[in-house]
């Protein structure tokens, strides 16, 4: 199996154009510029003791009413400074849904082994190889831009030393990266099974938009990537139970997407 994965890695790597990597870097360079020159809050839900959403401005000041709602202005600033560099995670699902098809050379049905008896093992190897390539490129750019933004905030914000907490930043970056990784793998599975047409990509994008708007009015975390990102990037304390829940939900998401795609593919091959 390891040899097959390696073979697929070389095959998919030859398929990916160098312009794709340049495009990813250009997109995230724009993300850095956008975050430094944008609104202080994106898609936020303010509630008692926790503000969900994306907060690109590390110098955001609370109003008197918001201070009473959150409970402690100093705790808010401490959390805000260390999660602000992750705000551009809002766009990650949309970027991934559009870029992942570039890492998929062809759909499973189009492959010469698409309907063979050995398709199961080869499909798993193909998904693993494609997920590795796309995750390395997308997550690498995401993590790099987050670190760059954190360093810029440390240099620009006057009271950065007071709120600097590298452990908190790395912890939130890790959680956010896990959610992004799960979404990338799910996107690879969907595109591998159903292609990169308007239907599959449109469905991926629609789920993200719907999840954000539902989470704005929901009291608890939804087991959807965009919803989980609003928590990991939000100015809200996360307990160990919530972090474990995020990891479990990520695994369930990937497994659910794989199960749905596999079932639909079997039905399609049987009746078509």
Residue ranges and their predicted role:
Residues 1-25:
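Aromatic- and glycine-rich beta-strand/loop motifs that create alpha-glucan
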Residues 116-123:
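Short helix-to-coil transition segments within interhelical loops
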Residues 21-29, 197-211, 223-228:
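Central hydrophobic cores of alpha-helical transmembrane segments
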Residues 3, 219-238:
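Short hydrophobic, aromatic-rich alpha-helical segments embedded in or entering the lipid bilayer
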Residues 107, 213-217:
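Transmembrane alpha-helices and adjacent helix-loop boundaries
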Residues 24-103, 127-197, 204, 233-253:
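Secretory targeting signals
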Residues 8-11, 252-272:
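Junction motif at the cytosolic side of a transmembrane helix
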């Amino acid at each position: 199996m390891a040899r097959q994965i390696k073979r697929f890695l070389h095959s998919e790597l030859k398929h990916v154009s160098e312009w794709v990597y340049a495009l990813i870097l250009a997109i995230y360079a724009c993300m850095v510029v956008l975050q430094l020159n944008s609104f202080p809050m994106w898609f936020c839900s303010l509630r008692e003791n926790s503000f969900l959403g994306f907060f690109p401005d590390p110098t955001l000041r609370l109003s008197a009413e918001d201070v009473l709602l959150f409970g402690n202005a100093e705790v808010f600033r401490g959390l805000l400074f260390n999660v602000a560099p992750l705000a551009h995670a809002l766009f990650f699902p949309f970027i991934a849904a559009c870029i992942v098809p570039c890492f998929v050379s062809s759909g499973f049905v189009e492959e010469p082994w698409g309907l063979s008896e050995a398709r199961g093992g080869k499909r798993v190897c193909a998904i693993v190889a494609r997920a590795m390539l796309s995750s390395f490129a997308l997550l690498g750019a995401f993590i790099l831009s987050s670190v760059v933004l954190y360093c810029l905030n440390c240099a620009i914000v006057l009271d950065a030393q007071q709120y600097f907490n590298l452990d908190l930043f790395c912890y939130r970056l890790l959680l956010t990266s896990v959610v992004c990784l799960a979404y990338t793998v799910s996107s690879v599975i969907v595109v591998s099974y159903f292609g990169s047409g308007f239907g599959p990509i449109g469905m991926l994008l629609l789920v993200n938009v719907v999840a954000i708007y539902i989470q704005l009015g929901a009291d608890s975390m939804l087991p959807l990537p965009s919803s989980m990102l609003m928590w990991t990037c939000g100015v809200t304390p996360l307990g160990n139970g919530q972090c474990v829940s995020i990891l479990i939900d990520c695994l369930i998401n990937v497994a659910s997407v794989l199960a749905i795609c596999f079932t639909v593919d079997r039905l399609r091959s049987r009746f078509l």
